[in-house]
């Protein structure tokens, strides 16, 4: 299993989530955060010279089966990319074990994959 962490623009979150749901990955963790990379706290739509130390970002974490790595990354990139600096980064790390606390399921059975969440209110 792999943990895929993506730092993206907040306004791209809904589109990325929709793309992940379409490929069978509805479950993820999302955290609001601030940061900057090469753009150094500049936003292309702000007045020239306006600079802040950090820009709003969203970090999403999703644990996937190894075989799904490429399609999950494709979904994130296609939903998050604007082509401008500040689109974000993706980090991938190995997960040794996953355990669903409620049921005790382990490994890939503990992942929220291919489950129908459309019936939830």
Kindly give the residue locations of the regions a language model identified.
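Positively charged, small/polar-rich N-terminal and surface patches that mediate targeting and assembly
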Residues: 1-121
């Amino acid at each position: 299993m792999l943990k895929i962490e993506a730092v993206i623009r907040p306004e791209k979150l809904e589109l990325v989530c929709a793309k992940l749901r379409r490929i069978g990955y509805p479950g993820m963790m999302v955290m609001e955060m601030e940061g900057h990379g090469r753009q150094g706290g500049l936003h292309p739509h702000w007045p020239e010279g306006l600079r802040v130390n950090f820009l709003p970002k969203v970090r999403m974490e999703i644990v996937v089966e190894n075989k799904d790595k490429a399609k999950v990354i494709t979904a994130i990139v296609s939903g998050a990319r604007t082509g401008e600096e500040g689109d974000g980064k993706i980090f991938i790390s190995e997960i040794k074990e996953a355990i669903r606390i409620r049921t005790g399921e382990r490994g890939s059975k503990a992942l929220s994959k291919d489950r129908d969440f459309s019936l939830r209110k």
